[in-house]
Amino acid sequence: METNDLGFVASLMFVLVPTVFLIVLFIQTNSREGSS
């Protein structure tokens, strides 16, 4: 089975984008709680 580069990139982004979003959100809440 040949690997489809476009499909691979699409699945990578599909997993990566929400993960990065959650990490950034988590860091922002932590810094807000720490500063206040």
Swiss-Prot record:
Protein's cellular compartments: Cellular thylakoid membrane
Protein origin, superkingdom: Bacteria
Transmembrane domains' residue ranges: 7-27
A Pfam match: PsbM
Example GO biological process: photosynthesis, light reaction
Principal place of residence: membrane
InterPro entries, per database record: PSII_PsbM (IPR007826), PSII_PsbM_sf (IPR037269)
Role: One of the components of the core complex of photosystem II (PSII). PSII is a light-driven water:plastoquinone oxidoreductase that uses light energy to abstract electrons from H(2)O, generating O(2) and a proton gradient subsequently used for ATP formation. It consists of a core antenna complex that captures photons, and an electron transfer chain that converts photonic excitation into a charge separation. This subunit is found at the monomer-monomer interface.
NCBIfam families: PS_II_psbM
Family per record: Belongs to the PsbM family.
Protein name in UniProt: Photosystem II reaction center protein M
Organism name: Synechococcus sp. (strain CC9311)
